[in-house]
Each structure stands twice: as C-alpha cells, then as structure tokens.
UniProtKB/Swiss-Prot annotation:
Species of origin: Mycoplasma mobile (strain ATCC 43663 / 163K / NCTC 11711)
Key word Ribonucleoprotein present: yes
Record-level Gene Ontology MF annotations: structural constituent of ribosome
Family: Belongs to the bacterial ribosomal protein bL32 family.
Gene Ontology BP annotations: translation
Name used for this protein in its record: Large ribosomal subunit protein bL32
Organism phylogeny: Bacteria, Bacillati, Mycoplasmatota, Mycoplasmoidales, Metamycoplasmataceae
InterPro entries (UniProt xref): Ribosomal_bL32 (IPR002677), Ribosomal_bL32_bact (IPR044957), Ribosomal_zn-bd (IPR011332)
Domain of life: Bacteria
Pfam families cross-referenced by the UniProt entry: Ribosomal_L32p
Keyword Ribonucleoprotein assigned: yes
Amino acid sequence: MAIVPKRKTSKQRKRLRRSHHALDIQNLVKCSNCSQKIQQHRTCMFCGFYKNKKVEGFQARNDR
C-alpha cells in the first residue's frame, strides 16, 4: 500500500510553499560601446562587444 497524506494541504500552506518560485528581476546595465541596456556579464546583442572588446564570430542583431 502507498503512503497517504494525513490531512489535506491547505491553500495557505500550498501558496507559502510556492512563494519561492517567483522569477527574479533581471539586472540590466548599459553597454559600454553602444549604451543599449543589456544583461550583466553577457555580450551585447546589438553591437557584439563584451568588456570593451569585439567578440569574434558573434552575429549582432540589426533589427533595432
């Protein structure tokens, strides 16, 4: 036989358990080359620069 819960999980307890599942807000910074907002520690998708250096083999987006 399988184990069965002793009591029904209340709405409050269920929601408190899920309160840690929320997504975090992204931390955006300005690109040092083109001043667009980008995520930290990522290559700029608009100009292809990372830490003031051009990343080789990176295809920058031109749609914006």
